Amino acid sequence: MTSLFDALSRSNDRLPSPNFLPEDFLELLKSNDFDTKLTTLIRAATIAKREEDWFHKFQKKGELFKCIDKIICDDRWELQHQCIKFLVEAMPTFGSATEYCMCFVMPNLIPKLVSNKVTVRKITHQAIATFLRLKPEALQSFLKMLSNFMPNCNSKSELITELHHILIPELVKSNWTCLVENFTTESNIQGCEDQAGVLMKKLHYFIGNEFWQKIITNLSPEKREVLEQITANVQVEHTESKAGSGVLRASAKPQSGGERRLRFGIVPSLVCALIAEDTDANQRISGLEKMKQVVDQITPEEIARLVPHLHSYLLMLSNVLEDLNFKVVVLALDIVRATGHHLKGHMEAHIQQFVNLVAKHFGNQKSVIKQIIMMTFMELFQNINPKTVGGCLRVFLENKNSRVREEVINIYTASLMTISPSKFNLQPLVNILVPMFHDVKKRVRLAAFEQLSVLAYLLNGKTEIIMKPVRDFEQDQNSRGLTEAVTARIRRQVLPRIRYDGLIEYSTPPMMDSFDLAEAEMSLPSNADLSWIVSNGGVEPDPFERTMSPISLAGNLATIRRNRVIQQQGQAEKPSFSLPQQPAQQASHQAQRLPNGIEKSHETSENSSLDIGQRIVMTRMKSDDSFVRRQGSAASNPNSSTSSWEAPKRPPISPSEKSSISATKKEVNNNHIVKKGNLKSMRARSDTNLSEDHGEEEMENDPPRSFDDRPAKASGQYSFQDFDAAIVPSSMGKKSISHHSLPITSHPPLKHAISQPQKRINNNGTFLRSGQGQRTKSVSKPHRELTAVSKTYSLLDTSNMSVNQALKKMSSDEWADKVDGLNMISTLSETQPRMVADNLKEVIIAILNECKNLRSSVSRVAIVTIGTVAQNLNSKIDSEMEKICAVLLSKSGDVSNAFIRDDATDSLNKLVKAATAGKALQGIILAGAKSKNNTIRSSCANFVYDIITIQGSSAILNNQNALSNVLPVLLQFSRDQSPQVRNPGKQSLCFLSKDPNFDRLMRKNALESEIKAVKDVLANVEKRGGVDSLESTANLSGSLSRIGSTRRVQKKLPDSLQLDLDEIRTELLAAGWERRLTGLQRFEEMCGHASKAVASDTRLIEAFISRLGDTNGKVASCAMETYISTMGSMAKLYSTESNLKAVMNQLAHALTAHLSSKSEEHKHLARTCIQHTIRSIEPVSLLPAMTSATKKSNVKQRPFILTQYCELSKLAYKSKPKQVEVMALPLLWDSVKNSAPDVDNKKATQYLAKTLAKLIGEKQLLDLATSELDPNRKKQLDALIR
């Protein structure tokens, strides 16, 4: 754990970390930055409340309290308040060290009782009272420190007033002699005798007359006389409150009714007291209503008084917003809105706190709250820079709650529709929006596409700004169809609208409610956006991201089982013949039928409405893996549940019968609500009424009566009623959550022969539960003979099998049925290939869906099946090559399971040999050539080489289209960073070059640039030993398999830290040079205490590098000074972090540009930066960037940069001599060929030549120069060396 904030990202179901507070926690507290300290204390208070044993695990307790003691003395009251609040929250966790720790900070804590800030005073006496409540025996220590402070106190009356709060019930029987002696000393109470008398009188009533007389008898006569004088004229009322506790009221000097104290400069203290009353909602509502009147009538003078107290004012509202009372929340949000409306630009300094305040109720489904939040942000966008507000909102797009993400997107959309687009930077908005298209929730994707329409309209035809990030994201995620979906939405030319209440009304009806398009229409290109919103590009959501609902939440378990039995009896009565399939258009008009084929009447349908209603309620309870599979297989399985449920299949009916049906049957949508009109007449529904129409909970669509209607069984419940008589294994109670506990414990390579998932049997013949392994106790169940378990289709009569039957089994929830279906497809492809070929599209889609199955035993069988089908169908598989290659290549790069990689590679080998060479080559290239996974690219390069060798060189070279597709890919492979990708690419080019007509055909069918690039690659191969050297290198590099199955996961930064980084980047890119200077200062501070976080943000580094070349001289100088000061903490990261290596070129070019500056200061700073860079960063990492900068340098820049490049080459040659030769020698040839006439450039070229001659050797250097330089230039080089 690298920072304090990482602890807050831990989910509730994880075990607490043994080192809960990180090592850099103390460094954060010692930081000079105000925001860093404040944020650290806020997070620490949260941790202290949540984890009881954090203090015992923390090692440096003494140093921690030294930091706290120092922060309490800080001049800024916000830090004082938060630090003392941390003590209040953490004090119960100190245990036996409470007295020692609190007495350590008490001398600096007591003076805060007389602070000029009411907030600090309140939290201080709360901390002291908490301490004394936990440790009553520590009262004497506290009173002695109080006595030491009294003589030096300048506000004794305020101090005495605050001491009333320590009269708590736990201290009734304690010894108060020290306090009485202190207050009977004349020097201590001079000028505040009345307040001291009131306190003494209250103490008298508090401890009782018996203890009071004991204290008085021990006083000296002088002090006894002083005590009688100060208490002589004081009267204290002793009344009983409702709770039964004693309440003392002093009547010495009552305040006049006209006097009142104002909190925050504008709010009467009486109103604040009503608001603070959290036990009585009516009083709090009354106080909020009065406060609302004050805020609505605020004057400019009152605004000036409120602004200095704005932090504590918003803190008070934040506490109120945590109330559970609806009216309280609405009034508080309305006050927040009014505050932002009246303060306008004054709110910018507290914008992050303001946004976090309102964000407490993001995702709330109450219409009033959503309206107030929308109004608040619309006014905020108008009064403050929209870019600042948008940056604060961005962090909530990563919230786990999908309703929060949807609401934030709608706020962005509304702001774009109401604010001038010139105030926004649309490109970053597009970059933020694009990942939302791939969100796991339909509602979020729908909201994102609505915002897309608005952005496309504002860009006024410049769609490339949108399409480029979409294509990049699609490539990064290896998802297909997003570009088409975005294009379809842009072509619709429809926009959402803002309703009368300020909320967004979508331009298209949400697919979760009703969708009047048939499935055939969904596949049209014009509806690609709707299809994407429904299916998310066919990507199955992770079932472990959803919380498993316990069976008890589903309702009456007895009712569920009774409905299940009725359903099984109904299914048993059905005839066992298969009905022909019909198109979706006809199926939507078919009538319901009873099991015996008789048509249901309208009355019968109405009588079953109660059962339908029960099923609607039960759909929320379905198991998560069936829900996931239902979404993923929507387009593939005609008999499975989809987002648009089809009617049951039946034979064609006559037109007269259709008319009679339509006259009696009401058309209902997916939620069984009677439709009132078609899609054109339907009012689009907003994000608000989307949930209001459904009641408090959102329901899933009700599928047909099929396998999805089976209620989820409780974990550990097993039944044999769901299976055929020949099948013995029990059903799974719960899906296995890890591939380590699968039934296949040994992982033999799967062959194309039929495979059945093995069942492990214990000694007594009972079965172990699937997914539990040997750790599960055996359960005695009735079972049949073992011979019935091993069912192989090779021994069955294949005439009884059909593709539809196999697809139905594959759509089952049970993994064993899925494997049976896959094995049936494999057998049918061997025995009846014509049947499989006629239904090839449906078969391939179903198998590919199972390739993505989370259970590896199913996915492996599916991967092997796809290879078997391809092997048996040969060229008939060509039409599905692209889909198959995309899935299998992604599986060949799977880092979690080496056996899946091997199976995918075997199936691809069969696919490549079976399909047409041209189609196979095209599919392989499209699926893997541009992947970012090294293993996938390596697999792709090897298969391309295999296909080229199968097809032959002449077939490629003579076909201009084929050559134009293959040649750029092979050049890309030959330049790849991974040797496993480079070597097959070079081998392919070498194979083509062996053709006798290679040169002629290349000149005829290839471009000149490609011919030159190919020659360079072939020359490099020959220089390194030819094709044989490539094969030996490939053998040394290893195969595609990886050692281990783990992947390094990039940890997500905490939201608060990421927000700081975003703010710094915004300031670095600001239009005003003063803000850019501020951004540089904050960047330097952030590098000092969170360098790894800075290094992880590539955009922040790029923004900093852009300041190195700033047009403003002050900013550029400050940036270079900042670069030098941060080099100590960032140097190692520049050498190791891949994202920083990617920006090294920009850094080198930015520094080199100042070498030709007219300003001597800039030139000196640039030289210093370059020298520090070469000394600090690892030479091999820096060498490519410096080579590029040296090549592009001009005449003025070249002498210095070339000299420094020589020093870098000396350092890098020790570890990477070949790399230095490859990079430095072309630079030397270029310098000799194009040498400048001035003396400095000649000296620099001579220094480079001598350096390389010393490193490589003079003779070898001249030999290498023979093929690069003409004789005259070679003589010049010889003269330079000598």
From Swiss-Prot:
Changing W1073E: Disrupts the predicted tubulin binding sites and leads to strongly shortened sensory cilia on ASER neurons. GO terms for molecular function: microtubule binding. One of its GO terms (cellular component) is perikaryon. Residues 575-592, 633-644 have a biased composition (Low complexity). The keyword Repeat applies. Residues 800-1022 are annotated as: TOG 3. Residues 1066-1282 are annotated as: TOG 4. Residues 33-240 are annotated as: TOG 1. Transmembrane segments: none annotated. Keywords: Cell projection, Chemotaxis, Cilium biogenesis/degradation, Repeat. The keyword Repeat applies. Residues 566-714 are annotated as: Disordered. Gene3D superfamilies: Leucine-rich Repeat Variant. Changing F34E: Disrupts the predicted tubulin binding sites and leads to strongly shortened sensory cilia on ASER neurons. Residues 268-515 are annotated as: TOG 2. Residues 702-712 have a biased composition (Basic and acidic residues). GO terms for biological process: axoneme assembly; chemotaxis; hyperosmotic response; microtubule cytoskeleton organization; non-motile cilium assembly; sensory perception. Detected in a subset of amphid neurons that lack wing- or finger-like ciliary extensions. Likewise, detected in phasmid neurons. Disruption phenotype: Impaired structure and function of sensory cilia on amphid neurons. Strongly reduced length of the sensory cilium on the ASER neuron. Contrary to wild-type cilia that display the canonical ring of nine doublet microtubule bundles surrounding central singlet microtubules in the proximal and middle part, cilia from mutant nematodes have poorly defined microtubule organization at the cilium proximal end, and no visible microtubules at their distal ends. Required for normal structure and function of sensory cilia on amphid neurons, especially for the formation of distal ciliary structures, but is less important for normal assembly of middle and basal ciliary structures. Plays a role in the organization of axoneme microtubule bundles in sensory cilia. Required for normal structure and function of the ASER neuron that mediates attraction to NaCl. Required for normal chemotaxis to NaCl. Required for normal avoidance response to high osmolarity. In contrast, is not required for normal chemotaxis to isoamyl alcohol. Belongs to the Crescerin family. The TOG regions are composed of HEAT-type repeats that assemble into a solenoid structure. They mediate interaction with microtubules. This is Crescerin-like protein che-12. The gene is che-12.
